């Protein structure tokens, strides 16, 4: 599944922002605009026993150019909240449910 970081009109959003995937499916987060973005999973809003650091980009690492990607595979079923740390305050947040 591909998730765009930034909409076509330049909005600071994930597209889609809420989605479901089967356990073990690769999620490809792809920078869609020229803004620096990243993908950080909220340690308080992921399934118990999952290490947020292992599935998140380091907060100082950014996808700067259009087309740059970050790939993650989630195996533990449940709901995961994530955000872009530079743009979290602007509402750039998302949620994935692993079935």
Curated annotation (Swiss-Prot):
Gene Ontology CC annotation, any one: chloroplast thylakoid lumen
Subcellular location: Plastid, Chloroplast thylakoid membrane
Record's keyword terms, sorted: Chloroplast, Copper, Electron transport, Membrane, Metal-binding, Plastid, Thylakoid, Transport
Origin superkingdom: Eukaryota
Binding positions (Cu cation): 37, 84, 87, 92
Cofactor(s) required, per the database record: Cu(2+)
GO molecular function terms attached to this record: copper ion binding; electron transporter, transferring electrons from cytochrome b6/f complex of photosystem II activity
InterPro entries (UniProt xref): BlueCu_1 (IPR000923), BlueCu_1_BS (IPR028871), Copper_blue_Plastocyanin (IPR001235), Cupredoxin (IPR008972), Plastocyanin (IPR002387)
Membrane topology listed for this record: Peripheral membrane protein
Family, as annotated: Belongs to the plastocyanin family.
Database matches in NCBIfam families: cyanin_plasto
Role, per record: Participates in electron transfer between P700 and the cytochrome b6-f complex in photosystem I.
Protein name, UniProt field: Plastocyanin
Species per Swiss-Prot/TrEMBL record: Phaseolus vulgaris
